[in-house]
Amino acid sequence: EDHVFRVDHYLGKEAVQNLLALRFGNAMFEPLWNARHIEQVQITVAETVGVEGRGDYYDHSGAMRDMLQNHLLQLLCLTAMEPPSQFDPSAVRNEKIKVLRSLRAIEGADAASHSVAGQYTSGAIDGRAVPGYREELGRDSGTETFVARRAHVDNWRWSGVPFYLRTGKRLPRRCTEIYLQFREVPHSIFPGAVPQPN
């Protein structure tokens, strides 16, 4: 077991690898990276493709298992974690575990108010007709191809800040982004103007 390495391939993306440097190597961002200054965090992984021949696999996993429970949670951990004691895999993993342990459980009746799921139907992307999920699969299915969830990290740094995680297939544009919305200033010096949050 000590010789087996399990790696989420999303962690190999350059932008994901640079997230730790942006956070912990940048004196401008780190002091602002908390609930006092950030109103909400949105993490989106949107794909324009359908299941593309992976229907049998995807129909057993869906967007929740295929994307949210691994890739999006990895991005949430990198966004919400505390600085590791040193830059090595063990220290980074320990900080990620602390974030996962701080996630508020979503149970029972709360599930409906904290998450939404859907399935793509036939339509058009970039003017090209595309089949719906069930047409691609060749059978009826209730498997979700889109999922969005509101999460909360209940710790000192992030108390009260919602994290919106969303992912899906056959969406209008392909993107992977982490969006932090900063809080409004306490008093605007520009009368009549309502500045947009950054």
Locations of regions flagged by a protein language model:
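Secretory/organelle targeting and membrane-embedding segments
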Residues: 2-198
